[in-house]
């Protein structure tokens, strides 16, 4: 990313690939998801957006003491955390916000629809994957399964944004199994819903 950005600016960020459009955009690098007209020269199709249908049974609902949070704003929601299918063990892993500004927890599934909470030893009796320091409240979070890493101990990468008594802090950590993460490292300045991803075509984060 550019290093000369104004950290305090509220204006929209520039979009380089829109400001400097190439004459020809190569799309033979892999599968493409067409969400706009950027890569389309001409077409004869009519866009039609349909109303989403809400399933009567949610994938997750508050059940555990951590999620119920003593009745204050119960939460069991994926938020920005992430859901991954891990081919190593054939399991879907759903990372989610458990309890208002509290935990990051793990639920697993064989089909991607029916999830059960994976009890872990990070905090006995819970499915918490990361125990924050006392007084720290989690905000945005993101977990990424890196299937191209050359370091098995870094297959899972996690970002957390915390509200702390001393000020906001963002941290990253890595894990081999997606359940036990190493000591986190503090990042530079960023926002509460900061995210990250890996582009397998360009081989860049």
Model-found features: residue ranges?
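Carbohydrate-active catalytic/glycan-binding domains of CAZyme proteins
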Residues: 1-205
């Amino acid at each position: 990313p550019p290093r000369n950005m104004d950290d305090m600016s509220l204006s929209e960020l520039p979009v380089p690939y829109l400001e400097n459009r190439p004459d020809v955009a190569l799309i033979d690098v892999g599968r493409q998801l067409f969400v706009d007209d950027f890569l389309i020269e001409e077409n004869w199709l009519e866009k039609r957006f349909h109303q989403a249908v809400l399933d009567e049974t949610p994938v997750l609902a508050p059940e555990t003491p951590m999620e119920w949070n003593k009745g204050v704003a119960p939460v069991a929601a994926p938020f920005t955390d992430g859901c991954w299918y891990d081919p190593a063990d054939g399991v879907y892993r759903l990372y989610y916000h458990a309890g208002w500004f509290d935990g990051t927890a793990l639920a697993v599934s064989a089909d991607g629809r029916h999830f059960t909470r994976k009890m872990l030893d990070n905090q006995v009796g819970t499915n918490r994957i990361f125990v924050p320091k006392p007084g720290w409240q989690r905000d945005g979070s993101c977990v990424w399964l890196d299937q191209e890493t050359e370091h098995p101990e870094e297959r899972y990468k996690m970002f957390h944004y915390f509200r702390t008594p001393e000020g906001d802090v963002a941290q990253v950590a890595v894990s081999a199994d997606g359940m036990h993460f190493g000591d986190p490292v503090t990042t530079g300045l960023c926002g509460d819903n900061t995210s990250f991803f890996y582009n397998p075509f360009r081989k860049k984060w």
